Design a protein with these regions (language model features):
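Catalytic machinery of carbohydrate-active enzymes
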Residues: 1-61
Length: 61
């Protein structure tokens, strides 16, 4: 199955965000053409991988 859009929702809790990093890389490898977006609290945005792993970061306050 080819996915065009994937949304990761890990808004806060640093440990949860760090544990999701390998998943983000695996999703990029498995679905190279998908747009991957991560929803996160602004204070944790620095931990979200840059492109090409994550295409867009959305902030939830």
């Amino acid at each position: 199955m080819d996915y065009r859009n994937i949304l990761l929702i890990k808004m806060s809790s640093l440990g949860d965000i760090l544990h999701t990093l390998p998943l983000a890389a695996a999703l990029r490898q498995r679905y190279p053409k998908a747009k991957i977006t991560w929803l996160v609290h602004p204070q944790f945005a620095g931990f979200v991988p840059d492109p090409p792993v994550i295409d867009e970061v959305l902030y939830f306050d």
